[in-house]
């Protein structure tokens, strides 16, 4: 009888374990990093690594190290520090990535403050009634940025580009509110010269 009871108990334990496996798998799946515009978690981890938040081997699964990296990102960008990539964090990551691509494509040869200036122009346009009101719409507005036209936008941003975006998002604006900038040597439309220049940073003139 004792042996029988042990067998019954052991079988019950195994049954519980096997019943729990689907639940565990479902929970693990929920912790994979995914979201609109992202193929898998590796892209987010790679972005976090470029930004200095994550330095482990990149995989597609969520773990403690990734959660810590996400939490640090959230704290730096004013989001609830949940450690999980929900809709708000996903949107912020995407907006930062788009802005970093523009900064890198347009100003990678400029000083850090010049890069901050380009990021500030994007944010100033979002706030202006004369431009679209989202990061994506501003960046991809027709003929708005040379880097989008000539595909330099597709280059992978470096750490400096991300840092410049963060600086601008923190309220630093060396352009004094500019919504335009240009390099006189590369101007193809004289219309830009009709804009009032507010300041010059490196090779870029920033205008209202």
Feature-to-residue mapping (PLM):
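Bacterial extracytoplasmic/cell-wall-associated proteins, especially those involved in peptidoglycan
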Residues: 100-208
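Short domain-boundary/entry signatures in modular proteins, especially
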Residues: 90-99
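Short acidic, glycine/serine/threonine-rich helix-capping segments at coil-helix boundaries
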Residues: 33-41, 49-68, 72, 76-91
């Amino acid at each position: 009888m004792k042996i029988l009871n042990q067998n019954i108990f052991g079988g019950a334990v195994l049954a519980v374990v096997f019943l729990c496996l689907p639940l565990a798998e479902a929970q693990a799946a929920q912790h994979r990093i995914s979201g609109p515009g992202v193929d898998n978690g590796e892209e987010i981890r790679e972005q976090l690594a470029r930004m200095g938040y994550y330095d482990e081997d990149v995989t597609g699964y969520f773990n403690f190290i990734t959660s810590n990296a996400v939490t640090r990102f959230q704290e730096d960008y004013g989001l609830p520090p949940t450690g999980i990539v929900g809709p708000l964090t996903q949107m912020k990551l995407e907006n930062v990535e788009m802005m970093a691509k523009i900064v890198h494509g347009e100003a990678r040869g400029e000083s850090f403050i010049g890069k901050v200036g380009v990021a500030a122009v994007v944010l100033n346009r979002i706030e202006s009634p004369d431009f679209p009101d989202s990061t994506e719409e501003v960046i991809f507005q027709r003929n708005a940025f040379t880097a989008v036209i000539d595909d330099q936008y597709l280059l992978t941003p470096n750490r400096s580009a991300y840092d410049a975006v963060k600086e601008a998002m923190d309220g630093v604006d060396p352009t004094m509110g500019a919504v335009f900038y240009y390099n006189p040597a590369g101007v193809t439309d004289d219309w830009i010269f009709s804009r009032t220049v507010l300041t010059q940073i490196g090779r870029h003139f920033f205008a209202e």
